[in-house]
A protein has these predicted regions:
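Extended ligand-binding clefts on enzyme/binding-domain cores
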Residues: 52, 56-64, 195-196, 227-239
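Acidic interhelical loop/turn segments
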Residues: 133-142, 210-239
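Membrane-proximal, proline-rich intrinsically disordered regions
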Residues: 24-75
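A structural signal for short, hydrophobic/glycine-enriched beta-strand patches
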Residues: 33, 76, 80-108, 115, ...
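Bacterial Sec-dependent N-terminal signal peptides
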Residues: 1-34
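Conserved, well-structured interaction surfaces
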Residues: 90-165, 187-196, 207-213
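Short, flexible, mixed-charge acidic loops at enzyme active sites
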Residues: 168-181
Length: 239
């Protein structure tokens, strides 16, 4: 992390997953490791649904919004936890974070876990975005909804990383901070200044807004009987 992480409170709107434990584990494993696996996964609509659900399930892991990015690390940094009974002092990273001490091994380990898991989730959503264009014919009428939601998720994840790992400096002389990753394959993405980084965030959000104009949540459509109700719970998604 940079010299200082600004106190902030993450507002987590709805990572609500309506699956059993067994189903969750299966969907969470939807991470194609080869091009052949990806081609098979995205050969039908069910594969896209599984991949999108897998992104949400990945975000619900303890390293991300299942703990650290909701009531764990970021809450400690925001001084929402106090000393004593309200803080599990056996978890030494939290006690260090209370004093903004990021140099201890426990602190670094937790910071690395958050960083790695978030970029892993970004890579997964980038694969989904890539195949939404390659398999547009498979998605049909769902293209705008699936790709739009994926773009919004990518912007959301990157913005949270910016808030934690970059300085608040939007001047022309700002130093480069963190990368905005657009490709699913492992590659070194260039570090960007905060101002340039925000341009990418806004670009993804604007594209998402345009694609999601057909989303039932905006249209107020009754979709309870369509596709076994898949579109019926859009209010629980990022958009």
């Amino acid at each position: 992390m940079k010299n200082k992480i600004y106190n902030s409170q993450i507002v987590l709107t709805a990572l609500l997953i309506l699956f059993s434990v067994t189903a969750c584990n299966n969907w969470l494993d939807v991470k194609p490791k080869t091009e052949e696996e990806a081609e098979e996964l995205f050969s039908n609509m069910d594969g896209f649904k599984a991949a999108l659900a897998g992104v949400y399930l990945g975000l619900s892991q303890p390293e991300l919004y299942g703990r650290e990015m909701s009531f764990g690390m970021v809450s400690v940094l925001g001084q929402e936890w106090g000393e004593g009974a309200t803080l599990d002092n056996s978890y030494s990273a939290y006690s260090y974070f209370l004093n903004y001490n990021y140099e201890q091994s426990a602190s670094k380990s937790l910071i690395d876990a958050v960083w790695n898991k978030m970029y892993e989730s970004i890579a997964n959503v980038n694969t989904l975005i890539q195949y939404s264009d390659l398999k547009k014919d498979v998605l049909g009428d769902y293209y705008g909804i699936v790709k739009g939601e994926a773009l919004a998720l990518r912007a959301y994840m990157h913005f949270d990383l910016l808030r934690l790992f970059a300085p608040y400096d939007f001047s022309d002389n700002a130093k480069v901070a963190i990368p905005y990753v657009l490709e699913p394959k492992p590659a070194i993405a260039p570090q960007l200044t905060p101002a340039k980084f925000i341009e990418f965030v806004l670009d993804d959000l604007n594209k998402a807004l345009d694609l999601l104009k057909i989303d039932p949540i905006y249209l107020g459509s009754d979709v309870s009987g369509i596709d076994n109700g898949y579109l019926a719970n859009r209010n629980f998604h990022m958009n």
